[in-house]
Each structure stands twice: as structure tokens, then as C-alpha cells.
Design a protein with these regions (language model features):
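RNA pseudouridine synthases
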Residues: 1-352
Length: 352
């Protein structure tokens, strides 16, 4: 990555610029400092105590090399739907039934395997650095950093609460379609009985941790409810646990509800993910990122960076959920899931 230092950064310490402006983590910075050509200014290796000047050319060796790409993922040719890609990140639409990471029994059928094949074909070193993960049977948006620096930047944005994930789910049972933005706060814990199942609990008695979900009912019909939802926190199985706790389990969820002949998986899809683009602008002014949808042109295309340095991804529904929505709900429900900024605003607190 090459950056031309602007006049506004005259006199700043390089360390400050790397950490606050570019958002590099301490771990990423340490690796760059140990690399012979990790950080160069005007072609010369410098320390992070270097004082920047207008017109300096900063070069950061943040690309993986065969030596640094130590992760071994078997390249496997699998279907791969790319929503957006640049030098720093890639956004993908993960299909249902595909694990995110390799594991025992899933060594060559995962999203990581598909990406490894893509980059092996281009003769590029590969390390899989996803921003979070989706359950095998959950479809939708997965974003990954293509470099250590970009991944560190994404991780910082996530910790600062600047990343917004939106899901669409089909629930069993009919909620009240009142158009209200609902907020559910119910702590979640992992019972000691083993297995992967989580439950709503009490922080005092079983160590349950805080969990919050926002949701809005889009449509009801034929004994089911279509909801748009946002996990404000990121607990394991959070949406599945919360809706089951309300008495409206996700359709096809054989852990928190029951299996369904209509779908052979739980009807949950990661529809959209909004995040600040790595290195797009000054990172220290976090307040500017607080409400990225406010004032945004409703006709602005998704899956492209916005003028203010955000990316709002959008993953179309897979065939099984698209068919279920068509079978269960009126046509207006499909209009409520149109790929527009207006749809994204349905879960924005500032719009409630």
C-alpha cells in the first residue's frame, strides 16, 4: 500500500498516523516493524518515531508473502459469489450448507477453501481473515480482510461498534405487524449440559452475558412472520436463541425450534453488512461514523463504497428462502426486501 502524505499530516509522528489514521492494530504494527521492508518512507526504512512531512511517500508492505502466509487451507474449486472486492477487502455471499472455516469432516467444502482456490489461481498468497463467521446453515454476507493491515482495521471498527449486520429471518408463528422497531435484551449463556445449544439465562445464577437484538416485522401470513433483524451484540446463535425465547423460533431450526419440510435448514440469511472502508478517511474521528445512513441518498447503489467512506453490502436471498417468502407472504413482503438504502434504514435507530 502506497500513501502520499497530505499537508494536514505535516509534523505528525508516523506511529500516530499508522494507529489513529489508518487504524492499524498494535499486533499488525509489530509485524510491520519486524519486516525489513515493512514500513518505508521515500524508499527508506524508518522507525515509527519518524516525523511526517507533506509530500512524503509512505509504503506499507501489508501483502501476504509465501513466507508469511502460514495458514494452510486446501484450495478447492467451489461456487463463489463476490459482492465487492478491492485491494483491501472482499465481500462474499455465502451459500447455505457451506461452513465458513475448515474443520473435522469439512476439509474441502468451506468458504475458506473456495477463496484459497481463487487466490491460488491468481498465484497470490492466501490467509483467510473473515470479520466474524456464519453458521454452516446461515447464508449471506461474509467480509474478509485481504491483508493484515486491512483485517486489523476491520477488527477495530467492529470493537468500536461501527459495523452493522442485518439479517432476514422467517419465524414460526404470527407476530403483530405494527411497524415498530422492537428491541429485545435477554442475556445468553452456554448450559453445562454440553453441546452447542445456548439459552437465555441470568447473569447472577449462570453467568449469562448481555445480548441485544433489534427487529422489525416486515410481513405476516400463513402462520409465519418475516422479520428484519440486527444483533447489536454478537453472541453465538443470538438471533436463534432470542426468537425462540420470544416463542417464535426460526423456521427449520432443529435446535431451537423444530425441523420443517418447507426448508432443510434454518431460515436465516445475513442480508447486509455496513462498515467503514479500511483507510478511506481519518480514523480518529469516530463520531462521524455514528449514523452512516442519515442523509444517504435512497437511490445510492449498494455493494459500492459511498462518498463518506462506507460500504453497505447486500446479499440477495438464496433460492430456498426466496421461495419460502413467495409461498408464505404477500407480494408486498418482497418489496420490503428490495436492495435499497431505504430497506437498510428500517433498522436504523435514528429512523425509528
Amino acid at each position: 500500500m502506497t500513501i502520499h502524505i497530505p499537508a494536514a499530516c505535516e509534523g505528525r509522528l508516523l506511529r500516530s498516523y499508522l494507529k489513529l489514521t489508518l487504524g492499524l492494530s498494535t499486533a499488525v504494527l509489530a509485524k510491520l516493524k519486524n519486516h525489513e521492508r515493512g514500513i518505508l518512507v521515500n524508499g527508506e526504512r524508518v522507525t515509527v518515531r519518524y516525523v511526517l512531512h507533506e509530500g512524503d511517500i509512505l509504503e506499507i508492505q501489508d501483502r501476504d508473502t509465501p513466507e508469511t502466509a502460514t495458514e494452510h487451507v486446501i484450495p478447492c474449486e467451489l461456487p463463489l459469489s463476490v459482492l465487492y472486492e478491492d485491494d483491501h477487502i472482499i465481500a462474499l455471499n455465502k451459500p447455505p450448507h457451506m461452513p465458513t472455516h475448515p474443520s473435522h469432516g469439512h476439509l474441502c467444502d468451506t468458504l475458506a477453501n473456495a477463496l484459497a482456490y481463487r487466490y491460488a489461481a491468481a498465484d497470490e498468497p492466501f490467509v483467510f481473515r473473515p470479520l466474524g463467521r456464519l453458521d454452516r446453515n446461515t447464508s449471506g454476507v461474509v467480509v474478509a480482510g485481504k491483508t493484515r493491515a486491512a483485517s486489523g482495521c476491520l477488527g477495530r471498527s467492529l470493537k468500536q461498534g461501527l459495523v452493522t449486520k442485518r439479517y432476514v429471518a422467517i419465524l414460526v408463528g404470527e407476530m403483530t405487524a405494527d411497524g415498530t422497531l422492537h428491541s429485545l435484551e435477554a442475556p445468553i449463556y452456554h448450559p453445562s449440559t454440553g453441546g452447542i445449544k445456548r439459552a437465555v439465562g441470568d447473569p447472577e445464577t449462570n453467568g449469562a452475558v448481555y445480548a441485544k437484538t433489534l427487529y422489525r416485522v416486515l410481513a405476516t401470513g400463513n402462520g409465519h412472520t418475516l422479520v428484519l433483524c440486527q444483533p447489536v451484540t454478537g453472541r453465538t446463535h443470538q438471533l436463534r436463541v432470542h426468537f425462540s425465547h420470544l416463542g417464535y423460533p426460526i423456521l427449520g431450526d432443529d435446535i431451537y425450534g423444530k425441523a420443517s419440510p418447507r426448508m432443510d435448514r434454518h431460515a436465516l440469511h445475513a442480508l447486509s453488512l455496513s462498515l467503514p472502508m479500511p483507510f478511506a478517511r481519518m480514523r480518529e474521528d469516530v463520531a462521524e461514523y455514528a449514523s452512516p445512513l442519515v442523509g444517504l441518498n435512497p437511490d445510492l447503489p449498494l455493494n459500492l463504497p459511498t462518498p463518506d467512506g462506507y460500504l453497505h453490502t447486500w446479499a440477495p436471498l438464496p433460492t430456498d428462502m426466496e421461495q419460502a417468502v413467495a409461498d408464505l407472504f404477500p407480494q408486498e413482503a418482497r418489496l420490503a426486501l428490495a436492495p435499497t438504502v431505504t430497506t437498510l434504514k428500517a433498522l436504523d435507530v435514528s429512523e425509528a
